[in-house]
Amino acid sequence: MGKNVVLLIGMPGCGKTTIGLEASKKLGYDFYDMDRFVEEISNSTVKELFSISEDYFRDYESRACRELSSLKKKTIISSGGGVIKRKANIDCFKENGIIIFIDRPVEEILKDVDLDSRPLLKDGKDRLYNLYNERYELYNIYCDYKVINKYTLEYAIDKVVDIIKTCE
């Protein structure tokens, strides 16, 4: 592949973290959840950062992108859903990695996600639909590959693994 980093992008609740973790186990790659990484470097929770402002959180997220995109070991990273809001974040990963869009229909996300636990979704399902409408085109523009996650979890994991193997 010549590129060490695989970035998973998509809506909150689309399965990025679960798919990324399981795919990394199958491939022997390292795994990072970008939101957890942001919490480590900021010594704050995502919720606390958002309570200051979304831009404040996004600044830490951009720092995380710069650091994680330059990793030398084979790594899968699950991003936050809004990582695509700053093109510079995506540009970091285009240089040293591939970007896979985990595309899951909103109706499927709503079946599984606790909206109260997600800072940007606390206003309910209408907010999720609005985010989807705002971001969907960007996910498609920025991704190198797309995996539809509306079948079984194992199907989505296997698709991600297959894409990564093809790029090695």
Describe these PLM feature segments.
Residues 29, 44, 144:
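Short glycine/serine/threonine/alanine-rich loop segments
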Residues 3, 19, 26-31, 64-79, ...:
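Nucleotide and nucleotide-moiety/phosphate-recognizing core
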Residues 11:
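P-loop (Walker A) phosphate-binding loop of NTP-binding proteins
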Residues 36-91, 133:
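ATP-dependent small-molecule kinase phosphotransfer cores
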Residues 15:
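Conserved glycine(s) of the Walker
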Residues 2-3, 18, 22, 26, ...:
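NTP-dependent small-molecule kinase module
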Residues 96-137:
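A glycine- and Lys/Arg-enriched "phosphate-lid" helix/loop adjacent to the NTP-binding pocket
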Residues 8:
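Hydrophobic anchor at the beta1->P-loop junction of P-loop NTPases
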